[in-house]
Amino acid sequence: MRNLQTRIGLSTKKTDYLVAQLRAHFADCWVLGHERLIASMDNHPKDRHVLAAAVKCGAQSIVTYNKRDFAAAATEPWGIEVQGPSTFLRYLYDLDPALVVEKLEEQARDLGRSLPEQLAVLRKAVPAFVDGLCQDLRI
């Protein structure tokens, strides 16, 4: 959550609210008991807790913009692939295009936007995914 405060500039109050919402709506996603694994991780020291949590829960991948701190030599022994967000979203889209488009339309509607407007916003964070999606949808 430190990244939300330092990089995005969220206040402690907003960060605490977000964490509370994440815990309430994604209770099964919290990893516990990974702390003892941190010291044995070989990736960048400031991100060892992330790899330790992925190992503990049996994750197949870590999705991050920060691939440089998760070298293949550190993740491959654990069978963990490191992907950027655009790659991960494209993988989900390839698995079930209709569901991904449905969820994007739902997200846009919830935010009072059209799908093209929402995709324009998402393009800032995941340009390769949005470009590919727009090409597929011909929009």
Predicted regions and their residues:
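PIN-domain endoribonuclease scaffold, especially VapC-family toxins
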Residues: 1-34, 107-125
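Short histidine/acidic/glycine/proline-rich micro-motifs that form metal-
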Residues: 6, 37-41, 69
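Generic recognition of short, well-ordered alpha-helical interface segments
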Residues: 10-17, 49, 83, 99
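Acidic, metal-binding active-site segment of PIN/NYN-like and related structure-specific nucleases
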Residues: 48-81
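Acidic, PIN/NYN-like endoribonuclease modules and their adjacent C-terminal/linker elements
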Residues: 68-139
